Amino acid sequence: MAATLKRLLPLLCAAATLTCGRPQRIVVGSKNFTESDLLAEIVAQQIERRTGISVERRLHLGGTFVCHQAITTGAIDLYIEYTGTAFTAILKQPPIADADSVLRFVKADYERQFQVRWMAPFGFNNTFAILVRHADATRYHLATISDLARVAPRWKAGFGYEFLERADGFPGLARVYGLRFSQPPTAMDLGLTTRALADGKVDVIAGNSTDGQIAALDLVQLADDRSYFPPYQAAPVIRSAVLERYPPVAAALAELGGKISDSEMRRLNALADVAHRDIADIAREWLTNRLP
């Protein structure tokens, strides 16, 4: 009898594993810039501390389309997306200015098309920021993107790869504002654009309005006086199947809704990009202070 039980024990353990299902684990990804990495780490730590579920990080994966493919194929379960990006780049809609309308549309279409759920936005709007050096803004009296059109024929521009191709990026911006630069804009990694501008390699870039380096590098954001850019509210997007498998995750993510303002996001980004602090430490400190 004992020998029989000994032979059966591995099979019984395997059966128990199958019955109980796979080990609890969620895979969190991020795009290839600091803010996305930082928010993904905040989300990962929030899930771990509130639910006890193990989180695998796959940070700095790539751009919007890489992360979108990863979540729709199940390679990751969650990442941080922006409403205007989803609306124009993924769902191929023309840019509109109404934030609530954009959020409602992406929520409905993501659930219907991709079985992906939008959670509550963090609270800030990270729009594209057309940036110039402070000295140039003063010298040429630049306050708006319309002002930029006056000097653009003598200037060099440097833009991220996505911005050069997206429906809400450079092609539409150039059309709306009549921008014509001295040469075709230089394509570069988004994370390199601010330093290229500060170092004088280019004269204007498209960055992020919540970039912590804007103040540190003495850059100026030109006002979008023709309201070209749509709203870009950041929020976790997660596969619906994951929420069904792990119901407590929804409550954990809901706690993050509305907790980060534009200025707070700039401060957090600056801690990473200017003070060079570890993003895991920044995330842990923020969660401890804001959601004890």
At which residue positions do the language-model features occur?
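A conserved helix-loop-strand patch within extracytoplasmic ligand-binding domains
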Residues: 100-157, 240, 258-262
